[in-house]
Regions:
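Sequence-structural signature of mature extracellular/luminal beta-sheet repeat domains
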Residues: 1-311
């Protein structure tokens, strides 16, 4: 993968810690969710306000075609929130009679069909490192039809995370954080219902993703690949469990960087990006293009940030 350089970054403080994802609505307002469950709106004028509250930790989100904000929470499942009143409704809290404890990201098609990921069936967000270390491959991709029926499309994914639709609507692109891989789930054409790998052996762990105005797939690289975590992946499950039982300071750690990469949606080539270290921002977990700027969110800092969209 090419080496990408720094960019001029503007950091915007949030009224709380760890805004995990960031999305934009049709009116130009940005939305994010804090670790304590507060849902925050950043208006086109830059004014920051708290609009709602979730009981679980808000993670990936998207603006639905009916105007509501779809929010993945852990625990809690998939919610829909009225962006004016802050009222929330549970859309999915279980799949195949199992609690949806780690809903990770969500996207909606124009016909109202919703797709969402679950990172792991065992852990919640509070213990996400356990899923990475144990490397069970128990994440999944699901579809919620407009009538409310939920169908499992894919399972055995290695920490399924970011999810976006391609600009032409022919496929979904999803990220596997522990697998360090981007894949396409085809929605139309002769390959419909099948999966092809878009990019693999990534130099960092991908988190949330989004589709840019030109169709490029923007990927939040939450942390560079960790040699210790890589070495654990093929080991016996009992050894991985022992490592997970160690004190946090002895486990593989996240390296705080500002790291985001754009991939060609057809070839999987890395075509643009930004990478740098800052004392006031890093650990990028979400990103979205908005008015020529690349906005980024982070679980490591009480802020979001933005820079010019890299060419």
């Amino acid at each position: 993968m090419p080496e990408f350089g720094p960019a001029e970054l503007i950091v915007v403080p949030m009224p709380g810690d760890a805004p995990e994802d960031i999305v934009v609505d049709a009116g130009g307002a940005l939305w994010t969710g804090l670790v304590d469950g507060r849902i925050v709106r950043i208006g086109p004028d830059g004014m920051v306000s708290v609009v709602g509250q979730t009981t679980g930790r808000p993670l990936g989100m998207t603006v639905a075609h009916d105007g509501r904000l779809l929010i993945c929470t852990s625990p809690g499942g998939l919610l829909a929130m009225d962006r004016t009143t802050g009222h929330t409704e549970v859309l999915v809290d279980a799949v195949d009679f199992r609690p949806l404890n780690f809903c990770s990201n969500v996207v909606e098609l124009p016909d109202g069909t919703i797709f969402f990921t679950q990172s792991t069936a065992k852990f919640t967000y509070a213990n996400f490192k356990g899923a990475i270390i144990e490397a069970r491959g128990d994440g999944g991709l699901f579809r919620r039809d407009p009538d409310g029926r939920v169908i499992t499309l894919l399972d055995h994914l290695y920490f399924a995370n970011g999810l976006t639709a391609t600009l032409d609507g022919t496929a979904l692109v999803f990220a596997e954080t522990q697998g360090r891989r981007l894949s396409k789930y085809w929605l139309t054409g002769p390959q419909a219902g099948t999966v092809t790998v878009l990019a693999e052996h990534l130099p960092a762990m991908p988190d949330n993703i989004s589709t840019g105005s030109d169709g490029r797939i923007w990927v939040a690289m939450v942390t560079p690949r960790n040699a210790a975590a890589d070495a654990l992946a093929p080991r016996a499950p009992v050894l991985r469990k022992l490592v997970w039982a160690l004190p946090d300071r002895m486990q593989p750690q996240i390296v705080p960087e500002v790291y985001a990469v754009a991939f060609d949606p057809d070839t999987g080539a890395a075509v643009a990006g930004v990478r740098m270290k800052r004392p006031d921002f890093g650990v990028v977990t979400g990103l979205v293009e908005h008015r020529g700027r690349l906005w980024m969110s982070s679980i490591g800092f009480p802020a979001v940030a933005h820079c010019a969209v890299p060419a």
